[in-house]
């Protein structure tokens, strides 16, 4: 057996040995939580909320999540699907968590394998590579060869993960309870977004994900779903070498799916890869109702024949499948930009909750159909609309079901992979083989009737299409009915007054903070904690500088106002 030394992580990981020191874990989690709340409050106080500022804070938070370990890495990955809760900048930053998890010591991995499979590593495998092939938040993967000669990969769970997750479950539950009790703003947020339910759902899924027997069953089901698809490959599970903490799968090597240069060098047809990926995902979603909810590039590869390989079946999701005739109707609805029928299909599948005002969801569907139906998804266009979409989610009393957010994230990821291979790809063109397979599967009479009905509907839509003036009046009436009509007015005097009030409030807050910290430091001088007084005086000096800056700005603003009034 070949033994290869493994480099250790550069930074000590805070979750190691925590079962013996839970109080240190509590301090680490509390520190990150309080710092994050402080930074958000400081940003709101000292500067307008901007995408750039949020992005910097998101990068900082990613580093902290990596330091806190598996539970919090998974929380970040889960939050990257919640566009209805957090801004786009955080979603973008959280996607970086996929490939930045350091491996653990291979000696620990071997110890887990020997304990779970009841034998020495030399007896279990003919060959075992010590250096991990890949690592993730919950485990890492090693190559091996079975005694019967089959090449396999062995997925090993991080040691002590069970106790760590149980500890974090309790710590986060306590933190949520305290935050809801003492922070009124957080209490309102928790009620609006059902944070308690999200928390319970997250941990129930996480405990399922660390059960590798459950993942093996998912892989078998996925493999059976694609048994008749020769261009899609799914690794076989070796149950004799699989337990709750060890998963042994067939070794299927391939080129990373978004590595365009390597794929071209291997002579692989990129258009066919894109087509296979899009059609495979449509089949998962619309035919099987069982789909991979995290299809990032690390979970897919392309073999030497150009076939698509799927890995990692720990995070799967299910949706209600629709009948083939409904599917045909939905495709035609997309082609003719029928927002209402597309929305009906999403509600039927349980991807949108039919509660409250659905007009914002209609606007999103309309935006997608208008901008991305016949052309590649333009990231710049998404950037332009991202702020508006986030603001809409903040204002509306609804949230998307988890399945819908998984689908949105998956579509976005698949689109990114497709654009990396061919920036000019067309989603509808790539979906044609799947659409044809659906229509061919229909009985001829049923298909003819469906096509005739859709042609009739299209003709009626064209004949009854209102003029531009009529459309404008209809939209105006609809906005009035929904209470969405807004009138924008600007008053220079009002703007100046608001600026002065804002500066005066900032000055007052900084004055209070300066006085409070100065008083606290003075009191500390007369106690046994006198050495900490220097911190209080330092903070008082810092707040004093901010107070001085605010007062100068206020004085300058008053002078400018006087000059304007004289004119």
From Swiss-Prot:
InterPro entries: ABC1_dom, Kinase-like_dom_sf, UbiB_kinase. It comes from the Bacteria. Signal peptide: none annotated. Belongs to the protein kinase superfamily. ADCK protein kinase family. This is Uncharacterized protein sll0095.
């Amino acid at each position: 057996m070949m033994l290869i030394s493994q480099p250790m992580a550069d930074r000590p990981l805070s979750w190691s040995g925590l079962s013996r020191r839970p109080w240190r874990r509590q301090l680490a989690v509390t520190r990150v939580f309080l710092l994050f709340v402080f930074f958000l409050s400081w940003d709101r106080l000292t500067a307008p909320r901007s995408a750039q500022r949020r992005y910097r804070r998101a990068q900082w938070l990613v580093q902290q999540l990596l330091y806190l370990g598996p539970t919090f890495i998974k929380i970040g990955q889960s939050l990257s699907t919640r566009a209805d809760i957090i801004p786009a900048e955080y979603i973008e930053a959280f996607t970086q968590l996929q490939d930045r998890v350091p491996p653990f010591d291979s000696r620990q991995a071997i110890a887990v394998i020997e304990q779970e499979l009841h034998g020495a590593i030399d007896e279990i495998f003919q060959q075992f590579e010590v250096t991990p092939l890949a690592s993730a938040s919950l485990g890492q993967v090693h190559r091996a060869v079975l005694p019967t000669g089959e090449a396999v990969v062995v997925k090993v769970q991080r040691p002590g993960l069970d106790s760590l997750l149980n500890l974090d479950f309790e710590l986060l539950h306590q933190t949520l309870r305290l935050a809801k009790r003492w922070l009124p703003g957080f209490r309102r947020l928790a009620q609006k977004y059902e944070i308690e339910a999200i928390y319970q759902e997250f941990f129930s899924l996480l405990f399922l994900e660390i059960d590798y027997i459950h993942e093996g069953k998912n892989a078998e089901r996925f493999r059976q779903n694609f048994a008749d698809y020769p261009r899609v490959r799914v690794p076989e599970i070796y149950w004799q070498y699989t337990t709750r903490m060890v998963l042994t799968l067939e070794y299927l090597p391939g080129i990373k799916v978004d590595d365009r240069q390597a794929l071209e060098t291997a002579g692989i047809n990129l258009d066919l890869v894109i087509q296979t990926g899009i059609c495979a995902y449509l089949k998962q979603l619309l035919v099987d109702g069982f789909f991979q909810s995290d299809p990032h590039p690390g979970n897919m590869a392309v073999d030497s024949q150009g076939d698509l390989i799927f890995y990692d079946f720990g995070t799967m999701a299910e949706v209600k499948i629709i009948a083939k005739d409904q599917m045909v109707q939905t495709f035609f609805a997309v082609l003719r930009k029928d927002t209402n029928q597309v929305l009906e299909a999403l509600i039927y599948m349980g991807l949108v909750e039919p509660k409250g005002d659905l007009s914002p969801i209609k606007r999103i569907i309309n935006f997608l159909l208008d901008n991305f139906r016949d052309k590649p998804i333009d990231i710049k266009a998404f950037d332009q609309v991202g702020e508006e979409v986030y603001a809409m989610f903040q204002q509306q009393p609804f949230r998307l079901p988890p399945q819908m957010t998984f689908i949105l994230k998956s579509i976005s990821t698949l689109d990114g992979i497709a654009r990396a291979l061919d920036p000019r790809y067309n989603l509808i063109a790539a979906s044609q083989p799947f659409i044809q397979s659906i229509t061919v599967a229909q009985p001829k009479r049923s298909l003819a009737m469906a096509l005739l009905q859709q042609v009739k509907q299209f003709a009626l839509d064209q004949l009854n299409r209102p003029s531009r003036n009529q459309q404008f009046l209809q939209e105006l009436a609809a906005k009035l009915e929904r209470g969405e009509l807004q009138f924008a007015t600007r008053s220079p005097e009002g703007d100046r007054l608001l600026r002065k009030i804002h500066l005066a409030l900032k000055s007052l807050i900084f004055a209070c903070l300066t006085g409070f910290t100065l008083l606290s430091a003075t009191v500390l001088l007369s106690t046994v904690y006198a050495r900490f007084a220097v911190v209080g005086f330092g903070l008082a000096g810092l707040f004093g500088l901010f107070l001085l800056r605010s007062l100068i700005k206020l004085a300058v603003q008053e002078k400018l106002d006087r000059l304007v009034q004289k004119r």
